[in-house]
Amino acid sequence: MSIDSSRAPVALASYDNSPDSLGRALELCEAFSDFSSHHHVMIKPNLVAWDEEFPIAPFGVYTTTRLVEDLVILLKDYGCRRISIGEGSVEIKKGVGTKAAFAGLGYTRLAERYGLELVDFNESKSKAFAVGDDLKLHIAEEALESDFFINMPVLKTHGQTRVSLGLKNLKGCLKKKSKKLCHHPELNLEYCFSHIADFIKPALTVIDGIYALEKGALHFGNAYRKDVIVASKDILGADLLAAHLIGFSGKDIAHFRHYAERRNQSLNLSDYDIRGEDPAAHIKPLKWDWIWTEDNTGPGIFAKMGITGPALPKYDDTLCSGCSPIANMANILVLSAFKGKPLPKVEVLNGKKMQGRAGYDQTVLLGDCIIRANKENGNICHALPVKGCPPAADQVAEALRTAGLDVNIGAYRDYMNGQSVKYQGKEGYESRFFAV
């Protein structure tokens, strides 16, 4: 199939200085061909969550504040007078969300320096959009009402969706109840969030590849310095090129397929007008999936260490971002309880659809959703429900102890503190990219 000249070009630029590198990418993709200096611009970075107890190493997790500032500088040079930055960060701990991320990553100072408005989509009023008979998405009004919406995700892989790029970054514009609904056991995560772009209609997508993240999206991924920027007025075109750079074909990604099918758009990168750098020079395949034991009783390390007794089935696409850290915590705590001998037969469930299996003396249910899903489950001998959305970390540890697992909360804290500082002293990992 030949290149579709009616589609917006997709730019690939190397990042080597600010703001010129981004300027090259925007010029190549004709980013401002439909832009007026009178437009109200909304910038949507990826500030997925904020953790004050165990700070998330920012590389590859968050859109670099440096690139956001570069974009603001270029917009100001163009004469733009009204610029907002909006996000709806997940609250790992209640009350610690978007505003904490704005403060911690320099956005508060950025707003003061350039006269910007910061918007917490979690606090916004919303408009509802029906998708068929089963799905209604509540989207923050500010995300819908700007004249020129700029989507700024990070180049990363993701344990539930393979990649997390432009289409998925828009999930941060949803209200909390709609974010949860996307993880509904009878719906499909990637089908659900693929529709958000139909309503927001981003004018421009800029994918920040200064760092790329493998097996994201929070504390546990591995970041690599990559120094690329992908930009296009076509969100799918940008996502296809970015996915290609980290080893994925468009046909590999379910939410790409859903979006492309509705819009009768090609998933073949060869059909797009790629400008700038040669993509072949920047390809580095990244892993996305976490390995589990063959019998689905725990992460792959359980088999390596010879852990028997407990079962922690692999997460599925119903596990929300809020409960994801709790599920990881349970894995680490069970590891801490292992002293070389078989552990009690305890099953630990999360998400919204896992079903307790027969053969376990006790079943720990992490969160309100999985408690409801197993309310009538006759396979469960003795349930240990840990209520909450998400449940509190200390209550998770207490439930595991009640189940007979001698977990070491100190070992968990040490591990998490290690994740926070894992890039310290390593060449190329520069905190200046996340400060103003």
What is each residue range found by the language model?
Residues 1-436:
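N-terminal and secondary-structure boundary signal
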